[in-house]
């Protein structure tokens, strides 16, 4: 049986796309996924261009594949994702042994690209932006576990000054309303209990409602997803403060299936820096969203993205960012030092802050966030958490593990419970009393209801 190996870089959108690459090749050619690159007949790199030196990391990986290709001449090597969109045919120029180059919107064409490569002997490049076409050509998802991602839109139209995403993934395009609901319903029928709705700016969703001129916004989509039998939890990422409507805020007051956690990237807490970033909101507007959410859910868990060392960032600007972090009490974050991306407006900004200063700021920010994370975990001891059981514990297969609404892994034992009964609990929602907090997980005991 032929096998495909996929290495994924970057965001959850890329993770979703990688799963779809496997689904497409399985449905068309019977390829099965493998974790061993040396066993693969097809090797795909799903790339990300958000961080610095992304291109060089890709070519470094490709260089290691050259020897493997020499031993296995029929091996197919492909490069997809955002670096593929940026570099296109130049990837083949630098690495002639690459067989196919494809963008995020053309992954569904992989079987045809591979077939043309094998037929013609010529490397194939397709980095076009066909609007939403790929979703019409994807096979049904192969479910693994009780949680699943569902992409509801593609691209970004915000054009933040530092970001390459609009150039690599295209403008915002929403999937039709009924298509999203049909995919979620299909997943629920296969045992999925938790869906994560995905988009570059997921709350900018504007989906056409079949046969009418009406458009469904993100809040309406969530309401309908919540009505699908079997779906018990709804997450989404990534949201944009500029698109966080009052309708979406109000939904947290009446939709229990929306988890009590939100990832809402702020990037910075200086209005001057936010303006230079072209984010489209002020710090006050951002804090207003959190204030209104916590009026409805006082213990709402928050996470965010932060960029440290944006050109012109002063000590006073950074102090404002740290003040916001302390005020909100973020529970995890994705934080980075600014790296200029070629072709973006911010790449041309004057930057006179020494790298050592930026690094020191980042370390201070990350240490503060980590203190918040540990404090929140310790405060969960003694509470009863509703968790979705995902499967056996990684360290002890006789135990089970699941996740809380704020994404904590919880391990728990079931002494005296037969294996068959434990297996039936996978995919179920259970109450667990938290007894211990560790740096990266929690431990608890299942609560038996009388």
From Swiss-Prot:
| Cofactor(s) the protein needs | [4Fe-4S] cluster
* Record domain MTTase N-terminal: where: 2-119
- Which key words are in the record? 4Fe-4S, Cytoplasm, Iron, Iron-sulfur, Metal-binding, S-adenosyl-L-methionine, Transferase, tRNA processing
Q: Which residues bind [4Fe-4S] cluster 2?
A: 156, 160, 163
GO MF annotation list: 4 iron, 4 sulfur cluster binding; metal ion binding; N6-isopentenyladenosine methylthiotransferase activity
Indicate which residues the UniProt annotation says bind [4Fe-4S] cluster 1.
11, 48, 82
Which Cys pairs does UniProt list as disulfide-bonded?
none
Could you tell me which NCBIfam families the record lists for this protein? Answer: miaB-methiolase, MiaB/RimO family radical SAM methylthiotransferase
Q: Which family does it belong to?
A: Belongs to the methylthiotransferase family. MiaB subfamily.
What is the name listed in the Swiss-Prot or TrEMBL entry for this protein? Answer: tRNA-2-methylthio-N(6)-dimethylallyladenosine synthase
Species per Swiss-Prot/TrEMBL record: Cupriavidus pinatubonensis (strain JMP 134 / LMG 1197) (Cupriavidus necator (strain JMP 134))
């Amino acid at each position: 049986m032929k096998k495909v190996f996929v290495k994924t870089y970057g965001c959850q959108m890329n993770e979703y796309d990688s799963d779809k690459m496997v689904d497409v090749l399985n449905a068309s050619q019977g390829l099965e996924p493998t974790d061993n690159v040396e066993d693969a007949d097809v090797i795909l790199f799903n790339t990300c261009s958000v961080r610095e030196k992304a291109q060089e990391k890709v070519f470094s990986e490709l260089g290691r594949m050259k020897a493997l290709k020499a031993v296995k001449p029929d091996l197919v090597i492909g490069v997809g994702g955002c670096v593929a969109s940026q570099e296109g045919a130049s990837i083949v120029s630098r690495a002639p042994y690459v067989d196919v180059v494809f963008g995020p919107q053309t992954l569904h064409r992989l079987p045809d690209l591979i077939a043309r490569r094998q037929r013609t002997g010529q490397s194939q490049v397709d980095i076009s932006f066909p609007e939403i076409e790929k979703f019409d050509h994807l096979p049904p998802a192969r479910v693994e576990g009780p949680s699943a991602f569902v992409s509801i839109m593609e691209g970004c139209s915000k054009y933040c000054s530092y970001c390459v995403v609009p150039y690599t993934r295209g403008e915002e395009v929403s999937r039709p309303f009924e298509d999203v609901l049909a995919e979620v319903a299909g997943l629920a029928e296969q045992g999925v209990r938790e869906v994560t709705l995905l988009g570059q700016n997921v709350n900018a969703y504007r989906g056409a409602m079949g046969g009418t001129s009406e458009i469904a916004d993100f809040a309406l989509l969530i309401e309908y997803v919540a009505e699908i039998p079997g779906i018990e939890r709804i997450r989404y990422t990534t949201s944009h403060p500029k698109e966080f409507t009052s309708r979406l805020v109000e939904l947290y007051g009446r939709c229990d299936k929306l988890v009590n956690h939100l990832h809402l990237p702020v990037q910075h807490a200086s209005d001057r820096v936010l303006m230079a970033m072209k984010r489209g909101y002020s710090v006050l507007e951002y804090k207003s969203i959190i204030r209104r959410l916590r009026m409805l859910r006082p213990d709402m868990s928050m996470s965010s993205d932060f960029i440290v060392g944006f050109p012109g960032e002063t000590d006073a600007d950074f102090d404002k960012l740290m003040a916001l972090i302390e005020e909100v009490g973020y529970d995890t974050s994705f934080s980075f030092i600014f790296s200029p991306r070629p072709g973006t407006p911010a790449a041309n900004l004057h930057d006179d802050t020494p790298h050592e200063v930026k690094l020191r700021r980042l370390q201070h920010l990350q240490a503060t966030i980590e203190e918040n994370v540990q404090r929140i975990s310790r405060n969960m001891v003694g509470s009863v958490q509703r968790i979705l059981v995902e499967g056996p514990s990684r360290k002890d297969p006789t135990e089970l593990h699941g996740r809380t609404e704020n994404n904590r892994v919880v391990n728990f034992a079931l002494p005296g419970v037969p294996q068959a009964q434990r297996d039936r609990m996978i995919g179920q929602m259970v109450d667990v009393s938290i007894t211990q907090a560790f740096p990266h997980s929690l431990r608890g005991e299942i609560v038996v209801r009388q």
